[in-house]
């Protein structure tokens, strides 16, 4: 089911004004990737990028074309792990975050 433009705009607005929500969204994207839910991880990451650093600025830092990054994170994109981890590193550094992975039993 496709999300409406209004919903996406609401999410972006909240990411911009709510630090806890922004951090939780990045964590949710990373969790999705680690759980093998690649499409979900990419979708959340796109929203996060749109609301924070933006694809143009990200492309300058990562030294890749912004359209290439958008395609990589699009519904049909197939990003390599090194690209995903590079993007996550840039995002966490940009927001002055430290990411930890905690392993527990299910």
List where the protein language model places each region:
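Amphipathic alpha-helical interface segments used for dimerization/assembly
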Residues: 30, 88-91
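N-terminal flexible/basic segments that precede or flank functional cores
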Residues: 1-44
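Short alpha-helical DNA-recognition segment
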Residues: 50-71
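Short C-terminal boundary/hinge segments that cap the last helix of small helical domains
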Residues: 93-106
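Short, basic-rich loop-to-helix N-cap that marks the start of a DNA-contacting helix
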Residues: 76-89
